[in-house]
């Protein structure tokens, strides 16, 4: 008989590291789109209330163009840190794309999620004084899990639509404020 014994510790550690890298955003270390879609799909199978908060950072392109990508990275990580202070371990938070993020609040009714997002928006915009405005827009959609008809992509699409409505309203308000400032300066 011939026995071969091999230590696979390094291989297992490497596999684990690669798995983590495949599911994490390199800059923020939160989940990435792949991780999010997988977790959201699993959560939708459960019979619980889920509130999807689809967030889009405002002004990121401007910050990158005016102040450089290092400052843009700071802006993103400051946003992530602000969100993380307000979510629970059972909630899911991921970076979906460059300036787009999604939080799934587990068993958190729409009204409570809306209050939470407003609080986060206020904290984010007022924290860490910078030469530029800090804000994000957020679309919120509440769903009941356990419904096999629900698809993550459809929920994201609806939350994204809600987010753009808020962004559009915010821009109108911002333009009105600028108009008032311009008129009063004349």
Language model segments and positions:
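PAS-family sensory domains
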Residues: 1-7, 158
């Amino acid at each position: 008989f011939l026995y071969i014994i091999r230590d696979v510790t390094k291989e297992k550690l490497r596999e684990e590291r690669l798995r983590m890298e495949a599911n994490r955003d390199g800059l923020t270390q939160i989940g990435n789109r792949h991780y999010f879609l997988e977790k959201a799909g699993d959560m939708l199978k459960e019979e619980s209330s889920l509130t999807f908060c689809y967030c889009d950072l405002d002004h990121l392109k401007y910050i990158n163009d005016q102040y450089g990508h290092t400052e843009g990275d700071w802006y993103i990580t400051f946003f992530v840190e602000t969100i993380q202070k307000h979510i629970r371990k059972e909630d899911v938070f991921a970076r979906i794309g460059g300036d787009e993020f999604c939080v799934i609040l587990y068993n958190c009714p729409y009204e409570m999620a809306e209050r939470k997002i407003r609080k986060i928006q206020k904290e984010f915009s007022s924290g860490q004084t910078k030469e530029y405005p800090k804000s994000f827009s957020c679309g919120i959609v509440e769903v009941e899990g356990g419904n096999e008809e629900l698809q993550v992509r459809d929920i994201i699409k609806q939350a994204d639509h809600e987010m753009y409505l808020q962004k559009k309203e915010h821009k109108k308000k911002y333009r009105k404020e600028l108009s008032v400032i311009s008129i009063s300066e004349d």
